[in-house]
Amino acid sequence: METSRIAIAALALSASGLVYIAQREGYSEQAYPDPVHGTKVPTAGFGTTGPDVKMGTTLPPVRALVRLRADASEKEVALKRCIGDVLLYPREWDAFVALGYNTGTAPVCLNNERSGPSTIVRRLQAGDHKGACDAILLYDRAGPVIKPQDRCSHPDNRTCRGVWADRQRLRAMCLGEPTP
């Protein structure tokens, strides 16, 4: 039986949420070019980016785990600020933090087309938790979408099917369903 939802201010990414991110991102001791942005966004460890990560940077396993936790904590702070005072299950929080870790928090917080809060934020603030979890599936791209086939959810897309599979797993996690 699931416990009650908890105030977002009291939530922290769970150990299983952190392990999920680590497994999804994979580990690389040597910095590599980001799959979407190339060498403009060098990535090392468990998906770590930032001004201190350059091509040639090495991040040994222990440092990479410490950095993963610190990076995830930064995402949590940003998400708490944009989502506001809502109640969530820990599994919902884990899913939104994992999404923000992968996409960056700006897309999870804001809708640039509407100049306002994202669908996830609007639905959470309205108390529509299922709708907010379903909205994870809206993050179905890696890079710009020029034509429908560019969406990772499109059956003809062969370049980012892993992104779509991840979004389906995050939605299931958020809803407390078995992960596909």
Labelled PLM ranges:
Residues 47-49, 101:
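Solvent-exposed coil/turn segments that connect beta secondary-structure elements
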Residues 11-18, 88-97, 131:
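Alpha-helical scaffolds flanking conserved acidic
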Residues 30, 42-44, 86, 99, ...:
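Flexible, active-site-adjacent loop/turn segments at secondary-structure boundaries
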Residues 74-115:
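Active-site nucleophile-His-acid catalytic modules used for acyl/amide transfer and hydrolysis
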Residues 1-9, 16-39, 52-53, 59-70, ...:
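Long, amphipathic alpha-helical surface segments
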Residues 39-46, 61, 75, 93, ...:
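Small-residue-enriched, tightly packed secondary-structure blocks
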